[in-house]
């Protein structure tokens, strides 16, 4: 294997794209490597490409120790686990997969919407427990309800398109879009202030990157502005929602329920403040985990890692790195 450029994969990233890389490069894969920082540092010493998902914390310290590193490939959308500034200063390209799992996430959102609106998980548990409580599980239709999309990017846009098929009214808040933006005009969304979005939404779907502005955005004050009949769904980043504030809002009946694919801490452990609520549905960060989506995600990141190692520009990149000397 000597003489080949080395690629390290520190999490469970598999697929035809990785198999193609293995034919060209020295690919070292350990799905648990992210758990041991010392072993990870050692593995990156002579590595030119590094592929991760969302568990590996690619810190400035880790980057500083990887002198040969040229590209970090994030198999997925969010890259808040990567110190992009440090990578840029070190001349390292950060590539990602910005829309390859968008359909899967949008479909998961509607799975949560329908499960909440029709109380499907509770009804299922009741019947399996010997019950037949039809009155308890009266639901509500999506037709004619108002969907609020917080972040009308590649995923939020696809959620809005599906909402049209359900006959929903669509509101959106996105600081980067105007009323003439393609995502707005094609989805039929009306851009509104965040306060209007919170106040008028029957279903609120969150699609925000994690940064200092969005961290904790959905807190006690935000929940106080929502309808008591409204449902919250978050498939973006757990830290956008303040979990204890959400629990209090649910306890006080300020909102009707929540579907969360992401939490502030993942995995959350055996005890969590939201476990006791029947009107909360939790999934283990699986919104983008379909066979179809993951094949596309891995194919995209593998393509860009290969391009950078071949001296070509990445097609899907986060940063503009300072050229290495």
Regions found by a protein language model. Name each.
Residues 90, 98-146, 158-161, 165, ...:
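Phosphate-binding beta-alpha-beta segment of Rossmann-like dinucleotide-binding domains, i.e.
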Residues 135-228:
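Rossmann-like dinucleotide/phosphate-binding beta-alpha-beta segment
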Residues 1-95, 199, 219:
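An N-terminal-biased, well-structured beta-alpha scaffold segment characteristic
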Residues 48-49, 71, 203, 231, ...:
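Short, Asp-centered acidic motifs that coordinate Mg2+ and/or phosphate
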Residues 55, 77, 202, 208-210, ...:
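Short glycine-/small-residue-rich Rossmann-like dinucleotide-binding loops
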Residues 57, 78-81, 96, 100, ...:
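Residue-level detector of alpha-helix initiation sites
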Residues 94-95, 220, 229-325:
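Rossmann-like dinucleotide-binding domain for NAD(H)/NADP(H)
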Residues 11, 174-176, 236:
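N-terminal Rossmann-fold cofactor-binding loop
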């Amino acid at each position: 294997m000597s003489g080949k450029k080395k690629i390290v994969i520190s999490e469970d990233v598999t697929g035809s794209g990785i198999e193609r890389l293995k034919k060209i490069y020295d690919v070292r894969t350990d799905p648990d490597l992210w758990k041991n920082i010392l072993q990870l540092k050692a593995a990156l010493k002579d590595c030119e490409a590094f592929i991760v998902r969302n568990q590996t914390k690619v810190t400035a310290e880790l980057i500083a120790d990887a002198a040969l590193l040229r590209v970090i490939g994030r198999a997925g959308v969010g890259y808040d686990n990567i110190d992009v500034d440090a990578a840029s200063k070190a001349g390292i390209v950060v590539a990602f997969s910005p829309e390859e799992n968008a359909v899967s996430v949008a479909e998961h959102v509607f799975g949560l919407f329908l499960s909440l609106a029709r109380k499907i998980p509770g009804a299922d548990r009741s019947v399996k427990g010997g019950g037949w409580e039809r009155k308890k599980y009266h639901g509500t239709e999506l037709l004619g309800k108002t969907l609020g999309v917080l972040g009308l990017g590649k995923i939020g846009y696809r959620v809005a398109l599906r909402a049209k098929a359900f006959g929903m009214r669509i509101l959106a808040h996105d600081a980067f879009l105007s009323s003439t933006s393609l995502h707005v005009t094609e989805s039929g969304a009306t851009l509104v202030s965040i306060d209007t979005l919170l106040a008028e939404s029957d279903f609120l779907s969150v699609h925000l990157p994690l940064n200092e502005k969005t961290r904790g955005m959905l807190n006690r004050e935000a929940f106080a502005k929502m309808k008591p009949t409204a449902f919250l769904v978050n498939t973006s980043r757990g830290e956008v929602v303040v979990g204890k504030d959400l629990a209090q809002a649910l306890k006080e009946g300020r909102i009707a329920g929540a579907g969360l694919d992401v939490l502030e801490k993942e995995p959350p452990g055996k005890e969590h403040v939201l476990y006791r609520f029947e009107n909360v549905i939790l999934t283990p960060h699986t919104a983008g985990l379909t066979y179809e989506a993951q094949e596309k995600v891995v194919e995209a990141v593998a393509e860009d890692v290969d391009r950078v190692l071949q001296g070509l520009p990445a097609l899907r990149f986060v940063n503009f790195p300072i050229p290495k000397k």
